[in-house]
């Protein structure tokens, strides 16, 4: 996680576009870490609701789509600037949804059972 923050800060100084590709990956790693700790704290695996699992899978799909959109923007920007503009707007919305969904997922997990 420390390496990811250092890498993100370095890229942020260079260009904000690349940082937007890295930030969802850092959120993805942070969520995986907190959810794995949540599972380890449970005495009986049968008591875990399937709801966090469904949120986890949907979150992963959104993160990967967001990263793919950002990579495609960089590729389009190199090839043709006019192609880049509509995809840039769409991926910015997707990136915003991705960040908000992370907050909702983390809020849905029981705080008393997670000790980071």
From Swiss-Prot:
Cellular component, GO annotation: membrane
Topology in the lipid bilayer: Multi-pass membrane protein
Membrane listed as a keyword: yes
Localization, UniProt: Membrane
The entry's keywords: Membrane, Transmembrane, Transmembrane helix
Protein name: Putative uncharacterized membrane protein YMR304C-A
Major localisation: membrane
Note: Partially overlaps SCW10.
Source organism: Saccharomyces cerevisiae (strain ATCC 204508 / S288c) (Baker's yeast)
Bilayer-crossing regions: 55-77, 87-109
């Amino acid at each position: 996680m420390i390496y990811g923050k250092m890498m993100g800060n370095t890229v942020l100084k260079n260009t904000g576009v690349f940082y937007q590709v890295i930030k969802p990956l850092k959120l993805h790693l942070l969520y995986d870490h907190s959810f794995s700790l949540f599972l380890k704290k449970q005495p009986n695996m049968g008591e875990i609701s399937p709801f966090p699992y469904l949120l986890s899978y949907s979150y992963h799909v959104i993160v990967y789509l967001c990263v793919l959109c950002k990579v495609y923007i960089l590729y389009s920007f190199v090839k043709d600037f006019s192609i880049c503009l509509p995809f840039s707007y769409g991926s910015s919305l997707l990136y915003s949804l991705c960040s908000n969904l992370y907050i909702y997922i983390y809020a849905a997990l029981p705080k008393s059972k997670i000790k980071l």
